[in-house]
């Protein structure tokens, strides 16, 4: 192999490595959605308001949402139980990769002191329409936990949800125990639930 050919091969490998780095960086940011562009001042105000709403110990506002299954779900229906409320999106690779764990966690809830609920906001933050989401989700094999449709984006706004996955851990008395942004494995979710009131 000639020296110039060797240099060309090295250069091509460097370019491939650089391209791979850009793809990885894009994937890491894929599950972070900021919606429409806002000024830094507006974003700071939104973040501050979201932080105010997500204070541990604060009473969580009741909601009334329709599920993909057509049933109506209210937070108040679960009074006396701990609630793991997971916000996700169909385009979020992390959310999709954790569906099996979420489903298993929900299967295990029978006889336990907690319940698993998931929330999707159709047409918000790049999500499909409600009809398209229902068709897509019903083709999957995750039937052990309700998926609620926040069609007006009210919960997203109330809890300042801008990244997926995100979760709220709600105590059995209806107060917020913890909010979580990003991936959480099943074992950590269970530990959090066990340590709640």
Predicted regions and their residues:
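A short beta-strand-turn-helix
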Residues: 62-83
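N-terminal targeting signals for export/organelle localization
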Residues: 1-62, 197
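Thiol-based oxidoreductase modules, predominantly thioredoxin-like and allied folds used
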Residues: 114-128, 144-151
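Conserved redox-active cysteine motifs that mediate thiol-disulfide chemistry
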Residues: 87-104
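Thiol-/selenol-based redox modules, centered on thioredoxin-like
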Residues: 169-197
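Hydrophobic beta-strand anchors of alpha/beta hydrolase catalytic cores
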Residues: 84-85, 116, 167
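Short, internal strand/loop/helix patches
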Residues: 133-170
């Amino acid at each position: 192999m000639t020296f110039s050919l060797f240099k060309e091969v090295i250069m091509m490998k460097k370019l491939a490595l650089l391209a791979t780095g850009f793809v990885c960086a894009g994937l890491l940011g894929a599950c972070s959605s900021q919606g429409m562009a806002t000024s830094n001042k507006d974003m700071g105000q939104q973040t501050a308001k979201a932080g105010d709403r997500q204070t541990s110990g604060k009473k969580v506002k009741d909601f009334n949402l329709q599920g993909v299954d057509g049933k109506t779900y209210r937070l108040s229906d679960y009074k006396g139980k701990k609630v793991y409320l997971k916000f996700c999106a169909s385009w979020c690779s992390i959310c999709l990769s954790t569906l099996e764990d979420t489903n298993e966690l929900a299967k295990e809830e029978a006889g336990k002191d907690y319940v698993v609920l998931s929330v999707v906001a159709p047409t918000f933050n790049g999500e499909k329409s409600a009809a398209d989401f229902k068709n897509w989700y019903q083709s999957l094999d995750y039937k052990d936990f309700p998926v609620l449709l926040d069609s007006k984006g009210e919960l997203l706004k109330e809890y300042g949800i801008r990244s997926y996955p995100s979760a709220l851990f709600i105590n059995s008395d209806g107060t917020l125990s913890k909010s979580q942004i990003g991936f959480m494995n099943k074992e950590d979710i269970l530990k959090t639930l066990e340590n709640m009131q």
